[in-house]
């Protein structure tokens, strides 16, 4: 009989043969096995008597967690700073926190409170991974939203939650192949997230350890003396024979030669002129060895200075060739301590400043074409990707290249600040500029897409002022007043608005456009139904930010009243100056 594919008769015969074996044999084997088990159990009787759930585990000892280090807070810091520090360390698990009080920086520091009004305290923190940073930034945004009733400005936070439209666009870009300037198709890792909290001027940077080391933001927010003390010296290659003597000798030799070149450069800056340019150039070339990056940089500075004085001695292409000689130098390639990415950034900025100095010898389009080719070539020497749009000076110089003037004189924020410092007793050089409107629009859009792409972000105040002054000196007054109104509305503090009113009056008086002055004094100066200087001046208890500011405004109002004394608005401005 077959059941489920097996022979039942065969199974029965096997069962019969099994049970027909002698019982004594089976019992003997079973007894022997039991005896062996008992003997083995005697060796470890203690463990056998303890139930399995009460036995000690042979796991490794539990590691003691590192204690959370909370940095000390600056003196007289707001309570919100303590809240954010506790939140980042205790709640989010971020480490290596550093707090910078920007009020302690020198006045000439680019991040001091005198130079900018947006940041008061800066917090740097490190995350374990990109996911950790994204999670912390997400929770931080929710905390600020529910606690302070507004959304912070967050940059660098990238989520995988992409809309269907964006996915289709990315898929099309993948089929076309990656562009020459990017390989991530706009989706970068959360290695650096910046959060402008909008609370007491506190800005928080969340970075991965690798990105924090490469960016070195501590240097940006620290004093220069502190940076020099904390700067780590490059490692010495100890595998080489007599490494100490050899490297020390070459370093001292390079420093000596650099001092000689620096003295020649300083002498030319002080005593050089059109006739002596060739002599200084020959003396410099005779002592130039090219053994260090600093020597090439000093040569670039001297050649650039000579080109401004006598372009027949040093031509523009010779200045650019200095940079290419530096990157093709075999001696420099063997020096492992050189940070080439930093050099590329510095050389790009220097080259842009050189293009600005060329003035009217080249049009804005020709200058930007030169810059495009230069950046395309120099970035080939970069070990890692470099994002020039993260550098503020790059954006400022990029906008500056959109216009030229006859003698390169133009009003900017530095000139207006100098007028205030001298209480109005300063006459900066002014000139009508030639602005390429289409090119300026393209540059503005380029900056917006690459650095200020979020709809909630706008250009920083200093860049918006630079653009506004460009429009005014180019005679584009419609765009000037449009940007002027936008800036005025963005200023929430009365003292900031007072300062903006003063620099506007100074700017228009130096540009000396009668229609623009009339527009200011008839529409905005004492407007009862909108924004006006008189209203802000009254709200500020008839006070200026400084006596220099008051004297500078008084001086310029008197000049306007004297020059346009036949106009009622000018006489009204002069009467106001008499009461200051």
Curated annotation (Swiss-Prot):
Protein keywords: Membrane, Mitochondrion, Mitochondrion inner membrane, Transit peptide
Keyword Mitochondrion among UniProt keywords: yes
GO BP terms, alphabetized: mitochondrial gene expression; mRNA stabilization; prolyl-tRNA aminoacylation
Keyword set includes Membrane: yes
Membrane-protein topology: Peripheral membrane protein
GO CC, alphabetical: mitochondrial inner membrane; mitochondrion
GO molecular function, one term: proline-tRNA ligase activity
UniProt superkingdom: Eukaryota
Transit peptide: 1-38
Places the protein is found: Mitochondrion inner membrane
Regions annotated as coiled coil: none
Chief site of localization: mitochondrion
Family: Belongs to the ATP25 family.
Known role: Probable mitochondrial mRNA stabilization factor.
Protein name, UniProt field: ATPase synthesis protein 25, mitochondrial
Gene this chain is encoded by: ATP25
